[in-house]
Amino acid sequence: MKWITREKIKVDRVACPWLIKKFIDPDAEFVFLPRSTDWTKISDGIVFDVPDCELGHHGEDVSFNSIMKKYNLTDPALMLLGEIVRAADSHPAGAGLRWVASGFGALGLSDHEILEREFIVYDALYAECRRQTGS
């Protein structure tokens, strides 16, 4: 399936593709479009983490949380990771995650290269969240 979001990815737009590939759609293809895209006109894929979409920010939830809810992902370790993604500025591990995301952006890589390189960070975070939650 094709999954579509905004270009210039950071925390949530790296975490979401990681979540999608690992737990929802291992064959997912990601497309990154400009912020100015009219998201309501896209019909050839699943739109996420853009304004006014089902798999976007709602209340205190970030797109990662919305995707977890939509696909009934209830693993305690994923729930903890969702808290870290949501609170990238306030959770003890969140500030570091924001710095990592900003650092990858500063390397001048394409969004696809950032996904390829940064997925290992989310693999490690998920492993630690599993350890922390005993799941």
Regions found by a protein language model. Give the residues of each.
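Conserved, aromatic- and glycine-enriched, well-ordered alpha/beta core segments
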Residues: 2-6, 12-78
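A charged, amphipathic interaction segment
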Residues: 70-135
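Generic alpha-helix detector with strongest preference for long hydrophobic helices that associate
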Residues: 1-4, 11, 45, 99-110
